[in-house]
Amino acid sequence: MSRFKWLSFLSNFPRPKMRKQPRLDYRNKIIMAPMVRVGTLPMRLLALEMGADIVYTEELVDLKLIKSLRRPNPALNTIDFVDPSDGTIVFRTCSRETSRVVLQLGTSDAARALAVGKLVQNDIAGLDINMGCPKEFSIKGGMGAALLSDPEKAAHILRTLTTHLDIPITCKIRILPDTLETIKLVQELAATGIAAIGIHARTRDERPQHHPHPDVLRAVASAVDIPIIANGGSRSMHTYEDLLKFQEECGADSVMVARAAQLNVSIFRKQGILPIDEVICKYLKLCVDYDNAPHNSKYCVQSILKELQETPRGKRFLQCQTLQQICEIWGLGDYCRRKQQELKEHGNGGRANVILTECLAKRQKLERSEDLADEYEGVICRNMAFLRSTYPSDTQLPKMVLYVLAGKLGKQAPSYETHQCDKLFRSICSYDGQRFSSSFWEKNKKQAEQGAALVALLQLGHLNEKTLLENGSLIS
């Protein structure tokens, strides 16, 4: 888009009213760092509950946010920024975090960054520009650590934002191989008027297994006046006291935590770490309360469980496809059902039954096709997921049970017709003059057939609906 078009685009944003809340102060703060797929609303709220002073969102890319629509969600009491192309939530926030949430932005263009800033500034406490991410996606787009190689562009982006927005602007960088060059870079960025700068104490090419360099951060902190936020010490962080120790080693004004918080967000508690099951329960309740995407909730729980995913309970968890199923494992099934019904009554459509959201648009396209409509006309459908871990032996699998039942009753064996959409499958089970199917799309043909057989067994009265609801197979 040309510069003229960008200026025209920006003119559509009215000058926001002055914010009533105090300007965010970055000194003497314990902060949850930006983490991809982790820093969504439930985890941010839990971090604040545990004692964090400031929470950062996961990195959100400017182009994705620019095209989103801001929508108040009265059912959840949230503000949602929605992708109009598929209805997915790009960014969700609420009043519980407004004064303490910082949105981290992935950008390589000052005009785009400003457009995002004007769109979101009334719903956040601060805006941070990612200048440290070494991932290939960021580098190729000229974002993240790529900006470390272009200080002039980095400074221009920051100066544009500090000049035109009412909220404090920060950036997050990595150290350079040379300490003096790092100091020079930080001084150039500080001169743009930013409120603070987060520094990961490793270079662009170093990874978590490498030791951080707190001595470099100490040298930088003594050379500038703005707050320095130390990051990169998770290897040695196991308790709240460890956070303060790393901050002191770096001579920093504040400390920012990523991996240690991802493993157990109760590291922010001054009173001590909580057991992981208690943390997971607290997290899942927030996921239910704020209708968090199941795939995102599952990813965060996996990060907490680590090697416990290999236990029987962990393996059952890995089979889960919905938030309801995950909650059943931690004794929150009734809470999830009750809350989702309550939210539905208040007008929240919800995404509780959606997994693999990257395939959502393809599913919707397939489901709208006339061919599929014809295929599923007259088919008895239920929201039924096949969870392999709930069946101890092959003889108990739904297809086998239905096959044996047909033999005992002298009826023709059931047959299956399966449809495929890219890597997703849905099957119709034909048995005794009727056709049955699950409304879920499964990862493979076998699971799709088992789901269809489950629907048949339930509708024919050979399975108990309450049992299926309790084990998470059936979503009401």
What are these regions (language model features)?
Residues M35-R37, L60-D62, G106-S108, G132-P134, ...:
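Active-site beta-loop-alpha junctions enriched in small/polar residues
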Residues M1-I31, V36, L41-P42, E49, ...:
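Alpha/beta catalytic cores of nucleotide-metabolism and tRNA/nucleoside-modifying enzymes
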Residues E59-P74, M131-S149, I199-P208:
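Glycine-rich, proline-tolerant flexible connector loops at the mouths of alpha/beta enzymes
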Residues L409-K445, V455:
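Positively charged, aromatic-enriched nucleic acid-contacting surfaces
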Residues I79-I169, R174-T182, Q187-A190:
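Active-site beta->alpha loop and helix N-cap motifs at the rims of alpha/beta catalytic domains
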Residues A453-T467:
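Short arginine-rich
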Residues W6-L24, M35-L119:
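Glycine-rich, positively charged N-terminal anion/phosphate-binding segment
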Residues T57, G126-P134, A191-R202, S254-Q262:
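Non-cysteine beta-strand/loop elements that form the S-adenosyl-L-methionine
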